[in-house]
């Protein structure tokens, strides 16, 4: 169940990312991203002096992200995009379960960019909200509703992060 005080309205998804990074990480925190990836994550994190840990595909898999590689990293946060931007990969139920459980067990802040939900091919991508209440889900009206100029996004956050978000929003 999501309560209304867990939803923060932002200036597009970029505003949600900035608010989330400022609310959750300090200078020198380590945040992992799977490459290939939407460049704004890397750029915003670096501008805040947050260390970016890029997880690249296996040597023989140029464009397939292997989420199990996260277990080899010591990080404070993980950003996933599902479906992925730019390669369109959609994580399986087993992969999402692994990501969620790994982050929960290791106290890694999990941020799920779900802006491409609803416009994927094949089976519909699952929201990280289906796996529990320890993830931050970011979305906007830009893609699914074809409203990019409106700059209207949101973040759904775990209750324990609410005070951090309120200080900055």
Please place each PLM-identified region on the residue numbering.
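A short helix->loop->beta-strand "cap" motif at the edges of active sites that frequently abuts
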Residues: 29, 50, 105-109, 133
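Conserved core segment of the aminotransferase class I/II
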Residues: 133-169
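Short glycine-rich anion-binding loops that position phosphate/pyrophosphate groups of nucleotides
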Residues: 14, 82-86, 143
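PLP-dependent aminotransferase-like
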Residues: 22-82, 101
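Active-site phosphate-binding strand-loop segment of PLP-dependent enzymes
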Residues: 59-123
């Amino acid at each position: 169940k999501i309560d209304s005080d867990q939803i923060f309205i932002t200036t597009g998804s970029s505003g949600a990312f900035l608010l989330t990074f400022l609310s959750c990480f300090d200078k020198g925190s380590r945040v992992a991203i799977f490459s290939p990836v939407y460049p704004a994550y890397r750029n915003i994190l670096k501008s805040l002096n947050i260390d970016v840990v890029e997880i690249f595909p296996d040597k023989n898999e140029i464009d397939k992200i292997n989420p199990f590689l996260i277990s080899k990293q010591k990080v404070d946060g993980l950003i996933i995009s599902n479906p992925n931007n730019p390669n369109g990969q959609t994580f399986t139920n087993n992969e999402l379960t692994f990501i969620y459980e790994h982050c929960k067990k290791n106290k890694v802040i999990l941020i799920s960019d779900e802006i491409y939900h609803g416009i994927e091919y094949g089976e519909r991508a699952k929201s990280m909200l289906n796996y529990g209440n320890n993830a931050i889900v970011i979305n906007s009206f830009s893609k699914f509703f074809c409203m990019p100029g409106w700059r209207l996004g949101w973040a759904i956050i775990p209750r324990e992060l609410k005070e951090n978000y309120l200080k900055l929003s």
